Design a protein with these regions (language model features):
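Generic short N-terminal amphipathic or hydrophobic helices
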Residues: 1, 16, 20-22, 41
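Short linear motifs centered on Gly/Pro in flexible linkers and helix caps
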Residues: 2, 7-8, 44
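Aromatic (phenylalanine/tyrosine) cluster motif
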Residues: 7, 19, 31-38
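Short, low-complexity intrinsically disordered segments enriched in A/P/G/S/L with frequent Arg
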Residues: 8, 12, 25-28
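ER/Golgi luminal nucleotide-sugar-dependent glycosyltransferases, focusing on the catalytic module
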Residues: 41-163, 170-375
């Protein structure tokens, strides 16, 4: 970046030019040396966003859900309501995109055929995607997020570079295309994380690693892409990389639970080598220990060296609302990060109050309707 006075000209890695105004050089810990307000970003790289959403208040969805889950009304079973309930913040997701990431080419809004009444389906940047548009018919309906996610590369018109969002991932501060892609590659952190847990989530991650270890030699990968595995920006997040450098197998990787950049070609390649396993488990209508998660595609990307090293923890944060509701509301209000995950849980106490506080924080930073909302 070349700066003269308060104006900056940046030669973007994607091949475009970004023009901005340098508005300050505040430091937050060791993470940020400056903030740049981008007035305009011109890039030759098309980047799409994909966001998945479900409206559990839809009567037809409730009927179908009860049919396949065996859960009626408020009955309890192994299927958590928190995985599906919508707490009314989706409009802030769209407002955040328009205000803080206006450079996005297209938003692929993925549902089982639902649409919020307020959403402008005819907006030129919105592509409404029904599960039936890209998931094989024999696996529908599905209530398993990992099945919905593993077929994303089949979405019609999806750009080769895309960022995947759950509907609880929010952009709350200005963010540039280079935060997600540099030199045509996803920005990510390659770091191990030892997790001795035997939870269902961990078992699914182990399923991923079986495929990774079958196709990659860990020592060879870490030697070939040494600088990417030991990038100085990782700091203490890379400590297990040093401890496990001589270990022969890949183990659990650190997973920043937030917006994830992908190459569409990564999905296509994984399907070529692991299509049998992915197809066999696509019939799981709800989460199961036999599943493979989207972390498989991310890990494959990393092992291929198809990423640019970036400590994603420096500007993202996941807030479990069951234990950190006040910190979550404060982070949104003060825009402490670029990206946040507001992780719901069926056991949240004072649910209405917690969500009310977060809504107030969103209204503070995103009070105006976006062009995605009907007037």
């Amino acid at each position: 970046m070349i700066c003269t006075g308060k104006f900056c000209l940046e030669d973007n890695a994607s091949g475009g030019i970004g023009f901005g105004i340098l508005i300050g050089s505040p430091v937050r810990g060791a993470f940020f040396s400056r903030f740049v307000f981008y007035k305009e970003v011109i890039t030759s790289m098309d980047i799409d966003f994909v966001v998945t959403w479900v409206d559990m208040n839809d009567p037809q969805w409730q009927v179908d859900f009860a049919k396949y889950s065996g859960k009626k009304g408020n009955e309890k079973n192994g299927v958590s309501e928190a995985r599906f309930r919508d707490y009314g913040f989706l409009r802030y997701w769209f407002r955040g995109v328009e205000k803080f990431a206006p450079w996005v080419r297209k938003i692929h809004f993925v549902t089982s055929g639902q649409k919020p009444e307020w959403l402008d389906a005819h907006h030129p940047k919105i592509h409404l995607v029904n599960h039936r548009d890209y998931i094989p018919e024999e696996f529908l309906p599905t209530y398993n997020s990992v099945v919905i996610e593993r077929y994303l590369h089949r979405i019609p018109g999806l750009a080769d570079h895309f960022v995947y969002f759950n509907d609880d991932f929010y952009i709350i501060n200005r963010i540039s295309p280079e935060r997600f892609f540099r030199n045509g590659l996803p920005c990510d952190i390659a770091a191990f994380h030892y997790n001795p847990s035997w939870s269902q989530w961990y078992k699914r991650i182990k399923n991923n690693m079986k495929i990774i270890n079958r196709h990659f030699d860990k020592k060879e990968v870490m030697a070939r892409f040494h600088d990417k595995w030991f990038d100085e920006s990782y700091g203490s997040k890379a400590r297990w990389n040093y401890l496990l450098k001589g270990y022969g197998k890949f183990i659990t990787m650190r997973t920043p639970h937030n917006a994830q950049p992908f190459l569409k070609s990564t999905f296509e390649e994984v399907w070529e080598v692991a299509g049998k396993e992915l197809t066999q488990t696509s019939g799981n209508k709800f989460r199961a220990v036999s599943d493979y998660t989207p972390e498989l595609f991310r890990a494959w990307q990393i092992c291929r060296g198809n990423f640019e090293p970036y400590n994603t923890y420096q500007d993202t944060k996941m807030f479990p609302l069951m234990i950190r509701p006040k910190k979550a509301a404060k982070a949104v209000y003060s825009q402490s990060y670029s990206l946040v995950c507001l992780n719901d849980n069926v056991h949240i106490r004072n649910y209405a109050k917690v969500m009310g506080n977060i809504r107030e924080s969103f209204e503070h930073i995103l009070p105006e309707k976006s062009s995605f909302e009907l007037s």
